[in-house]
Amino acid sequence: MYHLGQDLPGNDVDDIEDLISADDVKPRERYENKKTVTVRAKKRSQIRLESQEEEEKPKPTIHESVIPGTQKVFVKTWGCAHNNSDSEYMAGQLAAYGYRLSGKEEADLWLLNSCTVKNPSEDTFRNEIESGMRNGKHVVVAGCVPQGAPKSDYLNGLSVIGVQQIDRVVEVVEETLKGHSVQLLQNKKKVHGRRVAGAPLSLPKVRKNPLIEIISINSGCLNQCTYCKTKHARGDLASYPPEEVVERARQSFAEGCCEIWLTSEDTGAYGRDIGSSLPELLWQLVEVIPEHCMLRVGMTNPPYILEHLEEVANVLQHPRVYSFLHVPVQSGSDSVLGEMKREYCRQDFEHVVDFLRERVPGVTIATDIICGFPTETEDDFEETMTLCAKYRFPSLFINQFFPRPGTPAAKMDRIPANLVKKRTKRLTDLFYSYEPYADRVGEIYTVLVTEVSHDKLHYVGHNKSYEQVLLPMRDNLLGTRVHVRITSASKFSMVGEILDDERDWTRCAKNQELPNVQVQTRSRERLIQRYFGIALVLGSLAFLIQLVVRLL
């Protein structure tokens, strides 16, 4: 198993449960994106100038006669933890075959893994494609955008890897470097009449963070939300067998991971297609979690968690499971939820939150809101405001509605943009009006330290409630459990001081850096030896043929 250093450009991918994303589209980027889609009349001189630029655009170098597996690849990812995991798998296969992962400037090929949830994400994805081609790079695209809309004009002529074909990334990259275009968008074959969830979980990985393993437990979902484009890409629910998920977790811990993230489009729906359930899987997983390591359950929609509330509450109280759940509500109005086809009402969501807060001490509930859905009235929005004011969620992801092509909601009459912005600002102001951690100063927690903060100034640990605690950067601190006292707090995190001496830190994972370098080197050596051997055999054969010809 290979691990990718955190400083590698293009590898800073934040998952949907993160509070602050370094990869979010900035206002300046959004402005640049808009410029690329503005329709305006062009003067003849402009057309001639653009034609000249097209002719001057550098062409990608064709690697027809170069040994495969010796080039450099840049990997960039947009979107959720599921996409992040897919990128780690693709990077792992490329590294295992000898390809070197690099920054964008020195790379021969760019592998771009896309997200189709929001318009700005697709806009930046499209701009990155254009940037790569403008700089003479080979480009391979992957993820939900090409899977959901493969006939998009800007994808013409590009190599495409479908969401269920990531185990074939090496052959796609090889052919692309030779100047060919390959498109693999088909679903995996069914096994015993059941749709397969995707590529095998046993594939090699290059992890974004060597301490964290992201496991996709299922692909697709059972819903038909009117605003969602991801359904077009990921399809209906397909779950991995529990024994495969458990084995992947066991292997990850053996390789030095100290935290597992379960991810999918809806973890609560897990197992319904294979006669299992999320609680059954969770109880099997806790049996293989080593002491001092942790498990985090990913996003689950209200309808399916309702059926298992008691069991889920029990699992979340387990000492090696974070007391955290991401349950997106999207709106506080039953009318809007009906138009969204969310298959639950506000009362259902409130029951989930109330039950978990009562049964699971210190539980953190994160949720999502869409502002400005086409049918949302002022009264509907007020219901959303009262819901958020009632629960004061510490993690609240606020999104403006984006009409995604091909979805039913895209055909509905839209609310004026200025009204959508006004509502978004009102909800954002409400969210920033309270400090969820203001009363924590002086509290003592045990935290698992697994990450580096976005500003690179702190290490990041999480307590049992998966609340973020910033710590001073000290040698050997990553991958340990330590006791901390909270000294200050902000909107999104707390700052702590370490109470333990270094000799008392509890290490939950062994150092994997040296073995990874050795394994990767051995992989390249085997590749070189293989081609050297082939060349030697061919050379000997040619010599024998010449000798026979001379004798005759």
From Swiss-Prot:
Highest rank taxon of the organism: Eukaryota
Q: What is its EC number?
A: 2.8.4.5
NCBIfam families assigned to the protein according to its UniProt record, in alphabetical order: MiaB-like-B, MiaB/RimO family radical SAM methylthiotransferase
At the highest ranks, the source species' classification is: Eukaryota, Metazoa, Ecdysozoa, Arthropoda, Hexapoda
The record's PROSITE patterns line, in alphabetical order, gives:
MTTASE_N, MTTASE_RADICAL, RADICAL_SAM, TRAM
> Which UniProt key words apply to this protein?
4Fe-4S, Iron, Iron-sulfur, Membrane, Metal-binding, S-adenosyl-L-methionine, Transferase, Transmembrane, Transmembrane helix, tRNA processing
Return the protein name: Threonylcarbamoyladenosine tRNA methylthiotransferase
What is its subcellular localisation? Membrane
The catalytic activity, as recorded, is: N(6)-L-threonylcarbamoyladenosine(37) in tRNA + (sulfur carrier)-SH + AH2 + 2 S-adenosyl-L-methionine = 2-methylsulfanyl-N(6)-L-threonylcarbamoyladenosine(37) in tRNA + (sulfur carrier)-H + 5'-deoxyadenosine + L-methionine + A + S-adenosyl-L-homocysteine + 2 H(+)
Fetch the SMART domains from UniProt: Elp3
Q: Which InterPro entries match?
A: Elp3/MiaA/NifB-like_rSAM, Methylthiotransferase, Methylthiotransferase_CS, Methylthiotransferase_N, Methylthiotransferase_N_sf, MiaB-like_arc_euk, rSAM, rSAM_horseshoe
Relate the protein's function as given in its record.
Catalyzes the methylthiolation of N6-threonylcarbamoyladenosine (t(6)A), leading to the formation of 2-methylthio-N6-threonylcarbamoyladenosine (ms(2)t(6)A) at position 37 in tRNAs that read codons beginning with adenine.
| GO CC annotation | endomembrane system; endoplasmic reticulum; membrane
Q: Which terms does the record give in the GO molecular function aspect?
A: 4 iron, 4 sulfur cluster binding; metal ion binding; N6-threonylcarbomyladenosine methylthiotransferase activity; tRNA (N(6)-L-threonylcarbamoyladenosine(37)-C(2))-methylthiotransferase
Quick one: which residues bind [4Fe-4S] cluster 1? Answer: C80, C115, C144
Q: How does it sit in the membrane?
A: Single-pass membrane protein
Which annotated residues bind [4Fe-4S] cluster 2? C221, C225, C228
Origin organism is Drosophila melanogaster
The protein's matches in Pfam families, at most eight in alphabetical order, are given as:
Radical_SAM, TRAM, UPF0004
Per UniProt, residues of the Radical SAM core domain are 207-438
Do the record's keywords include 4Fe-4S?
yes
- SUPFAM superfamilies in the record: Radical SAM enzymes
Give the record's GO biological process terms.
tRNA methylthiolation
Cofactor descriptive note:
Binds 2 [4Fe-4S] clusters. One cluster is coordinated with 3 cysteines and an exchangeable S-adenosyl-L-methionine.
The entry's family comment says: Belongs to the methylthiotransferase family. CDKAL1 subfamily.
Q: Where are the transmembrane segments?
A: 532-552
Top enzyme category: transferase
